[in-house]
């Protein structure tokens, strides 16, 4: 039995060293990340959990984004603005104020990422707005929706 083990180990090592290396492909991951805030089902929600002491910053950034989308020249951006509803939870939550962005109908294949939209619509202000947004957000959750009725 002992004579059998070393040749088997040697064969396994040779086999592993000559086997093709399979690596995860970057494009699917990048594509998934790029579409993280799009809603192929035609409707969706984004939940923003915001630090209670930073709600004014968050709301200021959202107001600026809303203004920029309303003033956009591109028809797609105006469509986004028309169906984008923003809500703030009235319930008190210990760790976060919760904001809900509703997109119904969501423009198919369109990205609703606020950071990307700020960079596109107000490029000279984008970094400062991003810094305020980043400092205010605890986490973001996305939910695609399927219409039942």
What are these regions (language model features)?
Residues 1-4:
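Positively charged n-region of N-terminal signal peptides that target proteins for export
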Residues 18-24:
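Sec/Tat signal peptide C-region and signal peptidase I cleavage site
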Residues 7, 40, 61, 90, ...:
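Generic signature of intrinsically disordered, low-complexity segments enriched in small/polar residues
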Residues 7-17:
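Bacterial N-terminal signal peptides
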Residues 25-28, 67-83, 94-96, 102-149:
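An amphipathic, aromatic/His-enriched active-site/gating alpha helix that lines ligand/cofactor pockets
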Residues 26-83, 87-89, 142-145:
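N-terminal secretory signal peptides
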């Amino acid at each position: 039995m002992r004579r059998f083990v070393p040749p088997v180990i040697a064969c396994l090592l040779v086999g592993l060293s000559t086997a093709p290396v399979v690596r995860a492909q970057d494009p699917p991951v990048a594509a998934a990340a790029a579409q993280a805030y799009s809603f192929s089902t035609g409707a969706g929600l984004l939940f923003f959990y915001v630090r209670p002491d930073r709600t004014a910053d968050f709301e200021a950034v959202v107001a600026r984004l809303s203004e920029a989308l309303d003033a956009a020249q591109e028809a797609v951006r105006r469509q986004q603005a028309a169906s984008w509803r923003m809500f703030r939870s009235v319930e008190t939550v210990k760790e976060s104020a919760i904001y809900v962005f509703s997109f119904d109908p969501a423009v198919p294949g369109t990205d609703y990422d606020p950071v990307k939209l700020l960079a596109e619509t107000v490029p000279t202000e984008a970094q400062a707005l991003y810094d305020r947004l980043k400092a205010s957000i605890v986490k973001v959750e996305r939910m695609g929706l399927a219409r039942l009725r």
